[in-house]
Amino acid sequence: FARTKWCGKLECERKMKELAGVSSRCMPLKQSGTEGVCPVCGKALESVACTGLRCGHPWLDSVLVHANGETCASQSPLPVIASDTVYLSDCITGMRRMTDESVDLIVSDPPYLINYATGHRQDKAHDFCTPIQNDSNPELIQKYVEECYRILKPNCAFYMFCSAKTQDFFKTAAQNAHFTVKNAIVWVKSEWTMGDLKAQFGQQYEVLLLLNKGRAPFNGKRLGDVWEFPGIRGRKQLHQNQKPVELIQRCIEKHSKEGDVVFDGFMGSGTTAVAAVRMNRHFIGFEIEPRYFWIIHNRLCEEVQHHAPCLL
């Protein structure tokens, strides 16, 4: 079940589906009226559409994708926070409804605090010129890591991406929340950043902090702290800062077991949820932007169909 706000115009609905690549088998079910703003045209509204997306897969019908824990009047009340669920909500509001020590692993790609917005010319496949929400909000990061410490079980791990420029702030925020910084893993990508093309060398890596609450032993053999995974570009890219599924799978593999709950407060295009499904883990997440919320739903539809047929 998915809930999002739009103005009710067919052209706005089509635009949202184009942005997300929502397949034709995901059908809108009903509408309800409250106040809101259309995420496509930006118009202030008196009515809001409550759009349910159903793919015909029994497991996905139980994987709830909705906003702020609400349901239509015809639906029964939902649990406060359910596993195998992505919520259209800001992470802090949502996490405060989660119980203490309720997740086994956290993998997150929060805003890097660098006011990122790509300068690349828009093409038919992407619309990445919109700035990332909360990308200049250090208070959010501090609150987030504090909430992460609260909901994470003892002796478990938290992987958090950050940029080379801001990693000191992220480390300090984590330590202030009582995490132990175990590694600053270097993720080597296949492409360079743009920047000053005449006076600055292209940056080809991002930082992935490995944090522990207590002491979290890893699974399997010991790895080095330089990980090489190709970045995502072209039509396969659904989010301007999208991470490879294989990279997230490595994090999940090293610090969780089958059946564990993996949390991500900044779901983006849903890569953490997709990786969790592939690794036979449960997931909980939040995403604040409606257009990526649609993308998450569609990716989970495809993931269950192609990689987890036992869940159908």
Where are these regions (language model features)?
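Cationic, low-complexity basic patches in intrinsically disordered or flexible, solvent-exposed regions
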Residues: 19, 31-32, 76
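Short metal-binding segments enriched for Cys and/or His
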Residues: 12-26, 57-72
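Short, flexible, mixed-charge glycine/proline-rich loop motifs
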Residues: 1, 26-34, 43-48, 66
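Short, conserved SAM-binding/catalytic segment
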Residues: 77-81, 297-311
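Core catalytic lobe of class I
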Residues: 65, 71-74, 78-294
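Short Cys/His-rich local motifs and their 1-3 flanking residues in nucleic-acid-associated proteins
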Residues: 9-14, 28, 40-43, 52, ...
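BZIP DNA-binding basic region
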Residues: 1-23, 47-52
